[in-house]
Amino acid sequence: MHASGYFDVTLAPQAADNPQVRTAQIDRLSIDKKYHGDVQGTSTGQMQAIKDDRNTGAYVALEKVVGSLQGRSGTFMLMHYGYMSEDVVGRWLVEIVPESGTGELTGLSGTMKIIPKDGKHYYEIEYALSER
């Protein structure tokens, strides 16, 4: 199945909590999102990112979505992984953590594509709901 829409996101820097992270210059940010479209709801999470002065770097993130997907209510988790080289995206993968769905989203699996355009973040989700 296919779902699409956009989200508003706020990223807030968090304090580095150990010397190794400060030495490596790994940024830690909180994530707060509001989803519009086929996903209606909010999410919270955390991102870790690293980059150099050429804008080459990578990020990982985890978030929990609370709301509905095409009218089905529940929660699910997302796992992000991405990297870029000198501002060119090399890979950007967002997966629904399999079996993380609750409520009417139990059995949810799939992937999300994020498309930044004109100052907004659009999403496209390809997903399946297994019958349990």
Predicted regions mapped to residue ranges:
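Targeting-peptide/extracellular-domain and disordered-appendage signature
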Residues: 1-132
